[in-house]
Amino acid sequence: MVVIPLQNIMDDIERLKSEAGIAACDFIRDGMKLGLGTGSTVRYTVIEIGRRISEEGLSVVGVPTSEATRELAEKVGIPLISLAESGGLDLVIDGADEFDNNFSLIKGGGGALTREKIVAQSSKSMVVVADSRKQVDILGEFDLPVEILPFEW
């Protein structure tokens, strides 16, 4: 029997998430208006965008889908605008809670579902970043996020 320390497995998962998040940046072009998604993998995308702005002179603006993403984007130096100011987005990069073989998705388990949907609908294109642990045969294997908006209660 071979025992692999849990820390080694976690390090591998984080490395793969980092690689996936950084690879998503290959779709970004100078001058784009970006939707900045929410989640542990997209976090690496946001950090890489900040690095490219600082080190390579990339010129983009972002619209965050959550307060956590807003805080991180500000920290790494991504200029932010509101969705209303954007006039529409070129690309949104976001994560997924699970996806099936047809690439149908369930999103929003991180608590930013409404904002994620609004930003996605405002974008011309979307890149979804997810690792293989999120792939399922049938959607619904994990918890299903449900929106409840306190409108007219």
Language-model segments: residues:
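Short active-site oxyanion
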Residues: 31-34, 55-62, 104
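Conserved phosphate- and dinucleotide-binding cores of soluble alpha/beta proteins
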Residues: 2-18, 67-153
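Active-site catalytic pocket residues across diverse enzymes, especially alpha/beta-hydrolases
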Residues: 49-53
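Glycine-rich beta-strand-to-loop/alpha-helix junction loops that act as flexible
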Residues: 35-41
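Short, amphipathic alpha-helical "lid/cap" segments that border enzyme active or binding sites
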Residues: 17-25
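Glycine-rich helix-loop-beta junction characteristic of Rossmann-like nucleotide cofactor-binding loops
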Residues: 24-29, 54
